[in-house]
Amino acid sequence: MRAFQVVEFASPIVPRDIPDPQPRASDVLVEVASCGLCHTDVHLQQGYISLGGDRKLPVSMTGLHTPATLGHEIFGHIMAFGPSSGLTAADVGRPVIVYPWIGCGHCAACLADRDNECPMPQSLGWQRPGGHGERVLVRDAKFLIDAEGLNSDAGIYACCGLTGYAALNKIVRRDGPIGIIGVGGVGLMALSIAKAMSLGPIVAMDIDAAKLMLARQSYGAELSFDTRSGNVGEQIQQATGGLIGVVDFVGAQQTVDLAVSVLRTGGTYVNVGLFGGALQTPLAILAQRQLVLRGSYVGTPAELRELVALARGGRLRAIPIQNEPMDSINEGLTRLRAGKVTGRIVHTHRQVTATQG
């Protein structure tokens, strides 16, 4: 099969011919039709995650080694399976969304179906080959979400959607305005989900005027603010009286400082972004304002199933999708790195034919 791989960090991804994976035991082989492009792929391709300042976490320390096949927003069809998978010939060809945040399978988190909390992750597109290959091996059928009736862009629910849904779920209170910092692909999806969950009013924050206009005019954000403004915190406080929750999809120093400054007493800050910010809040202030500070990393398999059910109910407004061939992945990464993508890029593989194994 053909796989687009990181052969050397910070260098272009290379198409390579590699052997087809073979399913054993409970494995399921999925033929990948499409795979969304995530900003995490940018970090992994460059070889490190910023920890703020000059500090960097090499991705090799997280279990990613070259050659690596990235891609975790996978939509495909069941192609083959191992003898203990619980599947039958009738399942071959069935469309699925792949839950990629697979854990070790043995720790307390995994046994409680909270694979995204596993300390020894085996995530597809990270520690294990992902959807930038034409076929992907999934350890267990329980990580496959039925996608009958959904289009091939639905793989974005596995990260772009799940990340927003799980982060919103972590906001403790629901009795006031909620802020979303960064209304790119994930933030725009979170806005769509927030509206489907009847949360709000929603305050959108970004540095891109076009994205803010889209959030307000097409996705229902009641208010929007350009975070480059010198007194944006004061503007938000004046307009809302403070926010009960902020989800930060950027995670830079400026965004965390802004988020904490506009929270009401008892408010919740949820960080998702990986842009290298550092949280510095006096403990006396933390106690006095009774703030809740949370990190959020994708979500659980159950949350993905809940999100897909929400999508099936027709309650989610689709975000803009740019469908492009997998051959253009390097160009897509360049645009994503430069912040020139509204919504999501979804790369499609060349036509392949599923067969039973």
Language model segments and positions:
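N-terminal glycine-rich cofactor-binding segment
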Residues: 5-22, 39-80, 115-127
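Glycine-rich beta-strand-centered segment in the early N-terminal region that forms part
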Residues: 21-35, 50-106, 145-149
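Residues in the short beta-alpha loop(s) of Rossmann-like NAD(P)-binding domains
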Residues: 48, 208, 275, 299
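NAD(P)H dinucleotide-binding glycine-rich loop of Rossmann-like/cofactor-binding domains
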Residues: 58-72, 101-181
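Mid-domain Rossmann-like dinucleotide-binding core that forms the NAD(H)/NADP(H) cofactor-binding site
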Residues: 92-95, 134, 148-229, 234
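Glycine- and other small-residue-rich loops at beta-strand/loop junctions that grip anionic moieties
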Residues: 99, 157, 180-183, 204-205, ...
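Glycine-rich cofactor phosphate-binding loops and adjacent beta1-alpha1 units
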Residues: 170-175, 212-292, 353-357
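C-terminal hydrophobic helical "lid"/dimerization subdomain
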Residues: 257, 301-357
